[in-house]
């Protein structure tokens, strides 16, 4: 199951006692962490007890201000699978308990080295001695050791399988894919970036899923740009 705007809308989002914007997505069936709308004010993301095994490389572009990420009891398996988190430059608190990756050799030192902004890992403060040991083992970002290069080369092969099986998917002959020109694609991306609400993003996503090009994105008036391909 992928994260959708509808799921975000239906989840708890509030200001916590620390005055931070918090989004609670615990106890869902999410397998891929990504597909967020632009959410610059989000500070805390709770994702415990999902099925997350993949983190999209573009995650930091959508939630650049994230400081706390709780991924307890998910399915992340390899150290390199966590690499997209290093682009969350404000991430200080990370929880990965009850993921297969925590059983990997060098797990804690790897996170400390690869995501240097993290100050608390699995509720334990990162110590200066740990940072020094991590640097000794893995080198620097520009000059990694052979061990670091080896770890970076091992990633999980991930597939997004719907939780309800094949019945959740429409038959192949019913799936519509919109043909977009480069200019139409850029306009749609701009419309999503400049959307003022989640409802507006939902509308754009729904129109695309239904095989329609949102108004304002078509090339020219009366253009037949909303042709659909079965």
Swiss-Prot record:
PROSITE patterns: LRR. LRR repeats lie at residues 19-40, 41-62, 65-86. Transmembrane segments: none annotated. One of its GO terms (cellular component) is U2 snRNP. GO terms for molecular function: U2 snRNA binding. It is found in: Nucleus. Residues 213-223 have a biased composition (Gly residues). GO terms for biological process: mRNA splicing, via spliceosome. Its main location: nucleus. Belongs to the U2 small nuclear ribonucleoprotein A family. This is U2 small nuclear ribonucleoprotein A'. The lineage of its organism: Eukaryota, Fungi, Dikarya, Ascomycota, Pezizomycotina. The gene is lea1.
